[in-house]
Amino acid sequence: MASVLKNKDEVGNILVKVQDDLRQLKKNIVQFTVQENGEILDIQALDAAIIRTENGIRRHAEDYLKTINNQVLTLPSIEEPEKKTAHPKLVTWQPPYEALPIAHPHRSPIPGPSPGEKHKTAFIMRLLHNPFHPRNKEIFQQNYGIQLPHLQKRTSIGIQRVVTGSNLGNFAIAHLQPKPPPECQDAVAELQPSAADLSSVQTPVQPKAVHVLQREDSGQNESKKVYKQEMDVRRDGMALRRSAMESAESRLLRAPPPSAASASSDNRVLTRGLARLSPINPQSLPVPAVVSKYPFTIVDGQIDPDAADFCRYKKQYCLYWGAMVEALERLQRMLLDFAVPLARVCGERLAACVQSGELNWRDGRGRCTHVEKLLSVLENRDEVWDLMCQPGQRYKGNGGHQAAAVRIQTCWRRYSARTAYLIRLRSKWAAEIIAMSLLKRAKLCHLKKSLQASRLRQLENFHSRAESLATNWKHITSAKRTIIHVPSLGYSQPRRLSLRGYDVLQNTQMGRLCDIRDENVEVIYVSPVRLGEDVLQYYTRLLGLQTAIELGDASATESHSAKRFTILMPEALEDFSTRNLCLASLLKYSPRTLKRIKNLIKGKQAYMISGVTHTDDLAVADELQIPLLGTDPVVTQLYSTKSGGKRIFSSAGVDMPPGKWDIYTLEKLYEGLAQLMAKHMEVQRWLFKIDSEVGGRGTAYVDVCHLKSRPWAQQEFIRHEPQQWRTSQSQDSVMIKFLEEVPHLLASYARLANTSCYKTWACFLEHFLKEGGVIEAFPPSQSLTCLAVDLLLEPGGDVLMLSCGDQLRGPSGLEVLGCTVPQTSICPEVLHSVCTRVGQACQQRSIMGHISLDLVTFLDPNNLEQQVWAIDLDLGYSNQLAMTQLMLMMTRGTLNCRTSKLEVPPSETSVTSRFAVMCTRLLHTNLPLVYYSTFFLMCKAQGIGYDVKARQGTVFALHDSRYRRSLGMLTISENLQGALLTFARNLSIIHQEISAPNMQGASNFKELIKDIEEVLGMTIQNQTASQEEKEITGVGSDWLSTHKLHQHKMSQCTKPILQ
């Protein structure tokens, strides 16, 4: 048995050959009878000898199969190649024909078979040639003793017994014929094994992935020999689906294809249908290819039935020929259709595909899959596929003209159908677009109507509540009330987006909290920024100093007034942090904050004060069901512009600079400037202001000294008197001359006061004509003073002056940095008259609430009389008013604008008046680097603070906790010079403390310090003149002496512009 295990392949081949020879000998003996000397020979002895031989062979075969089936094979090392051994020559057994007697055919006639026997024999032969007939296996078992297995449709060949044979890496060997089902194994074991069961034809079984095991003792030479025998698994038609599922990068072994052409393939990837085949993995261990034993060729799509290779193949697979005929017909038809000249068929692969059911044409997976199956049985399938893929190859074969005609008709029908479909689809699409547009338009119209109805309802409620507020105003101001401060800047969207730090800019009015100095007032302040605990604690302690200030004792207990204010922050701050929405809009979309405000004001008299009124202010007031102390947003947008202010000043009858407004075209700009220059020859500079801009951003100027015709025009003006000049024809000729030079004058000599928003004159001019603007004369004087007055237009009809102060201007002279309170530049009676007329004009236009009026005063160079011009009007709560409220709380005083005095209740000292210098926004790039706690410790160390006993010192206004880019500062002293000196000293100390030698930073500190130092330098020179004027003028001495001081101060501020 050991020898059998050693040479199992040889023993199997010998047993098969002996079995075939015995079967052939028995068949020949049965077919004829022999006769010797005229007598019939007895061949029973020979038949018995053959039977005994068959029984012996059967026993040996059974022992062989039992031994092989019980053997467990182990795979050899991957890197250790199989040793090549010389295959022994197969021994072919032949019966000893010499020992047989010479048999001669019997000469006596043999009777032929009956018709029934002939019919039965023909029927049996038909059944034998049809392996799919149910009785095929039964007839084989009855007539030949062969138990055939059940033929089943399988996608892969499954081997259920232990495979025997030589170990080839991770591959096993099995015959093409499938194994009988398990229920027939016992019956088959009792019979003699057939030739198919013992055949040594090597075909692949189902491949299984085996992990590569590295061996340290394997040499490089052996590995090189193994890798030379590389195979391309892409040519295995039976493993198409499996190879598509396996990764090409995994280190796994693949089953080898049973094709002789695989070893010499060019490893090209098939396109289209074959593109799904996985590429060969160079890391896997290759195995030698198995050469086909039964190949045959198909020439020009036809099989030669007389060819030797085809006859040999047909003889080998005669039992399954009925199933192979259909596959061969399909293959021939395909080769004929594509005019393939030569195709080599691998017989074993074709038989395997037929038996496994892979060539089942009724699986419905498409023509591409059928072509794959057919090509998988060809040894030269790459060449055939390349030929089939050539353009027009199908039309060269059988039925090419008809196929071309079908293709043309198909393409044309497809084109026609596609065109008709696209036309219909386009119509359907157009209908859908129209329907969607109509639906969208209908919804938008409905939404617009809803919004209009909602805004109309809010506007009606605003007017009705305003009337109720006007009726009960005196009662409300004398009783306990709650004021809701919403410091919203309701600018237009382009202006809001162009402002840097818009949220902090809205929070520069924290001084509104100081309204709680009235015992009947509670304040709810809505902050547009997130305030930290440091800022909240600062204002809590600051507002709690009222008792200490009133008693003049810093150690006094904290006042209960700090409990009468609430600071709220809308929850929508984080949701709209980058959209620059005004505070009213943020509050509108903050339902929790609105609900909390409702709870705080429930059962109390309350009203709301906004900044620059916006439409959402009305929505918030309507949601809270409280009146709004402000102006209708439409009216605010109309009169808060530069042109709107000019119209109010004109109707009020106050003096204002010569100019023109509502300019929207370039021709009107040129003509208006030429007319103004010709009419007012004394004006040396003209200003251009954009209607919607604030803070001096949208201002430009041009000097008339650059006109070439200016000397000639001046001579013409001198020849006429001022009264005659306005009516003479010379003015018209001068205007025409000026009109010719104006375009060049503006393009060459126009300058911008602030380049932070508009860099060039062209950019400024574009926005000027787009948004509208005004032309305004600059005061014709070297000494001028600007001041601002805050008015309250009460719902009851009264006009109150809440604050008045002289402005501190920046280097450009057109930008406000701070102010001094109270004002000392204009006679209080004149100021009160101007403010009253402007306030009444505003009330006639339904303007209510807080407004801010900008004035300029100077001495007329012709008659040296003081002139007061109204230059600007802002509708809303101003920063100066907020700082004034902080000043009044810290001094416990009252500001009497009728006399321009800040009256403080007397204390231990005899001083009963104070002066204050305030700045709303002190900017420094190093301020964000210092926390507020460190900042106040620094101020305390440097002696910067507020004396509650003397009611003078320094107070800061904090704006936010996050960025800390700016802060406000207020200095209070017994006189104006002391307040200015304290303010300048504080700026100098703060600048030195927060700035390093190598990092000074950008700020507006230096400009303010320089301006204040120049003003203080003139104080000593004016003291003597002030004393003399007090003796002469009596009552008016207080404001006249300081008027000269401020005239010099403002002249110093405007010198950079006049140069």
From Swiss-Prot:
Residue ranges of every copy of the IQ domain listed in the record: 401-430
InterPro entries reported in the protein's UniProt record: ATP-grasp_IQCH, IQCH
Region annotated Disordered, chain positions: 245-267
UniProt entry keywords in alphabetical sequence: Coiled coil
Coiled coil: 6-35
A Pfam family assignment: ATP-grasp_IQCH
Name the record gives this protein: IQ motif-containing protein H
Source organism of this protein record: Danio rerio (Zebrafish)
Gene transcribed to yield this protein: iqch
